[in-house]
Amino acid sequence: MPDSADAPEEVPEFVDIVLEDDRWEDADLPAMAERAARAVGEWLGLDAFQVVVMGCDDARIAALNAEFRGKPKPTNVLSWPAVEFEAREPGAHPEPPGAEELGDIAISYDTCLREAEAQGKPFADHATHLLVHAMLHLAGYDHIDDEDAETMEDAERSILGKLGIPDPYLEHET
């Protein structure tokens, strides 16, 4: 019987995946989302948390966008935090969330692909950026005003840089 000290350490999964569009399976959304979640967790100083990510198409995300934001059109990504965050000074980092469940994310394959092609970016890099962006929203970041946008974009650049993904806010040739 092996010693429990010799047993491999169990690595927690951060992401539950719901695939409503099979193209996300081909793109390996589960691995992309898990990689993004681990990087966000490390950056936030969180050992474990849970996020639900739904990979869908433009029709589904347009319906969700209409229902929750009153905008009946497709968008790239939507997020629903599990907890409400206290107001903070503009540009300040939010307190790391204490909840184990951060919230839910929906990401549209169609819009993600269109944007990646228009910006001359690899699909996986763009999708990973959108997942990181949404996970930061779940952790209390936003980009409503310029100072908060700068703070959030700096966080995204830092996290994506550790993943080897170039700055998503640089101009790209098409």
From Swiss-Prot:
E.C. no: 3.1.-.-
Keyword annotations from UniProtKB, A to Z: Cytoplasm, Endonuclease, Hydrolase, Metal-binding, Nuclease, Ribosome biogenesis, rRNA processing, Zinc
Source organism: Paracoccus denitrificans (strain Pd 1222)
InterPro entries documented for this protein: MetalPrtase_cat_dom_sf_prd, YbeY, YbeY_CS
Similarity remark: Belongs to the endoribonuclease YbeY family.
Cofactor remark: Binds 1 zinc ion.
UniProt cross-references to HAMAP family, sorted A to Z: Endoribonucl_YbeY (MF_00009)
Listed name of the protein: Endoribonuclease YbeY
